Structure formats: C-alpha cells, structure tokens
Amino acid sequence: MNTIRNSICLTIITMVLCGFLFPLAITLIGQIFFYQQANGSLITYDNRIVGSKLIGQHWTETRYFHGRPSAVDYNMNPEKLYKNGVSSGGSNESNGNTELIARMKHHVKFGNSNVTIDAATSSGSGLDPHITVENALKQAPRIADARHVSTSRVADLIQHRKQRGVLTNDYVNVLELNIALDKMKD
C-alpha cells in the first residue's frame, strides 16, 4: 500500500513539475529575456504587422527582392491542405527527379550559369526568409530599373543589411530588405 501511495505522489509531483511549473518558467524566461523572439519576431511597418523575420514570403513584383522558391508554396494556412496538409518542409526529391528539374527550369532559364543556387532551389523548411548577398546583388539591376534608382544605390542597401554567415555565405533578410527599399528616399 505504501508503494502505491508513493507512486501516486511521485506521479502528481512529476505532472505538476513537468506539466505546469517547467512550461511556466520557460514561458516567463522567454517573455522577459527574449520577448521579440518568443512572440514570432514580427516586423511592423506603417503601424501594421507585415510579416516575421523568421518566415519567408512570396514576392512577385519586379520592384522587390524575390526570396527562395518554396517547396510548399509558402503555405502557412492550415485550412489550405497542400501536399497532404504539410505547411512547411522541403520537397525531399532527388537531383534526378523530373518534377524537381522542371521546377528548377521554371525558376531559372535553362543553361544560365549566372544564377545562384538559392535562387533555383528551395530550403529545407520551404519558408526560408533569407537569400545570399550574391543572389540579392544579382537582383539589384532589376530592382533599380523598376524603382528608377542607380544599381549602386540598391547594392549599398544590400551591403548595409547583410548578415554574416558562420559556416555559410553572407545573407540578407528579404522582408527587411524590401521594407528598406520602400523607405529609401529618391
């Protein structure tokens, strides 16, 4: 009988610790020390939330930088079932897969070796918010033409916003870069 009582007490204590106190402590630490990150790293522009630093968006206008292709078409709507309800993830297709090759040809004119790898392939999550600085610099002439500014001005904007990669190439956040373009004075 004593063993059963000890087992029940240990179960209740473990449930309170792991199911209530630990999550409460982690939530408080997150809200106090990492408020921005714990709440989705949201970006506000013109007094409205326009996106998150952590989630890529689909950009199509020529006056904006375009992010990486998305294997899930930037689907973040759980009601829109895409690929059996998956709203994030890579394609898991091999290099020889005909669908992958067709998609890459769609994003890149076949035979054009002047395209960065991140402009032609999706990320592992399918929602990557960053592109390489090299990719951004290759898009700069198109954006400069669309906005009637010099390419060097757009390139300076890219260099000012670049983030250093540790084991990767330098990169920029596409949403932050596009907001900076909109804020740019003529």
Curated annotation (Swiss-Prot):
Listed GO MF terms: ATP binding; P-type potassium transmembrane transporter activity
Family: Belongs to the KdpC family.
One of the record's GO cellular component terms: plasma membrane
Gene Ontology process terms (BP): potassium ion transmembrane transport
Subunit structure: The system is composed of three essential subunits: KdpA, KdpB and KdpC.
Family annotation (HAMAP family): KdpC (MF_00276)
Compartments where located: Cell membrane
Function field: Part of the high-affinity ATP-driven potassium transport (or Kdp) system, which catalyzes the hydrolysis of ATP coupled with the electrogenic transport of potassium into the cytoplasm. This subunit acts as a catalytic chaperone that increases the ATP-binding affinity of the ATP-hydrolyzing subunit KdpB by the formation of a transient KdpB/KdpC/ATP ternary complex.
Domain of life of the organism encoding this protein: Bacteria
Keywords for the protein's UniProt record, in alphabetical order: ATP-binding, Cell membrane, Ion transport, Membrane, Nucleotide-binding, Potassium, Potassium transport, Transmembrane, Transmembrane helix, Transport
Family annotation (PANTHER family): POTASSIUM-TRANSPORTING ATPASE C CHAIN (PTHR30042), POTASSIUM-TRANSPORTING ATPASE KDPC SUBUNIT (PTHR30042:SF2)
Record's keyword annotation contains Transmembrane helix: yes
Organism: Staphylococcus aureus (strain NCTC 8325 / PS 47)
Pfam families, per the entry: KdpC
UniProt name for this protein: Potassium-transporting ATPase KdpC subunit
Signal peptide: none
Transmembrane segments: 10-30
Topological relation to the membrane, as annotated: Single-pass membrane protein
